[in-house]
Amino acid sequence: MENQKQYPMTQEGYEQLEKELEELKTVKRPEVVEKIKVARSFGDLSENSEYDAAKDEQGFIEQDIQRIEHMLRYALIIEDTGDNNVVQIGKTVTFIELPGDEEESYQIVGSAEADAFNGKISNESPMAKALIGKSLKDEVRVPLPNGGEINVKIVNIK
């Protein structure tokens, strides 16, 4: 049996996925079953766009349920070590881009809970890969997608 990929995540991320799964199973799935039932009542299924749309939606919901169940089954909860001197998954890192003094902060999380719009970056991102394992006041080179790089200085870890 091959090794199954684990999904590192914070406890908060795990709980968020559990809520999402519950919503899919108890709200979204029954809603789409009802849509299918109503669409069937329209008669001929061969030319019934409402039925086709509802079946497609059902497929997406079932895929999401399977994906989330898989991630939860193979979740690796990253415990907070309490060490705010080293960057690790679950920590929020504040840094300044050098030269300069404008601060940016991101929480490093597992890919399953990454949400850049809310300041959560995946541990698999170039930024996080460059920061993980580094310490307070370290200067770090971060590769950019265009082949360049930026230099940042870590000013806070929490």
UniProtKB/Swiss-Prot annotation:
- Output the superkingdom of the source species: Bacteria
- Residue ranges that the Swiss-Prot or TrEMBL entry lists as coiled coil: 2-70
Q: Which Gene3D superfamilies match?
A: Transcription elongation factor, GreA/GreB, C-terminal domain, Transcription elongation factor, GreA/GreB, N-terminal domain
Q: Does the keyword Iron-sulfur apply?
A: no
Gene Ontology terms describing biological process: DNA-templated transcription elongation; regulation of DNA-templated transcription elongation
Q: Which UniProt keywords apply?
A: Coiled coil, DNA-binding, Transcription, Transcription regulation
GO MF annotation, one: DNA binding
SUPFAM superfamilies found in the cross-reference section:
FKBP-like, GreA transcript cleavage protein, N-terminal domain
Free-text function comment from the UniProt entry: Necessary for efficient RNA polymerase transcription elongation past template-encoded arresting sites. The arresting sites in DNA have the property of trapping a certain fraction of elongating RNA polymerases that pass through, resulting in locked ternary complexes. Cleavage of the nascent transcript by cleavage factors such as GreA or GreB allows the resumption of elongation from the new 3'terminus. GreA releases sequences of 2 to 3 nucleotides.
Similarity-based family: Belongs to the GreA/GreB family.
What is the protein named?
Transcription elongation factor GreA
Q: Which organism does this sequence originate in?
A: Staphylococcus haemolyticus (strain JCSC1435)
| Taxonomic path | Bacteria, Bacillati, Bacillota, Bacilli, Bacillales
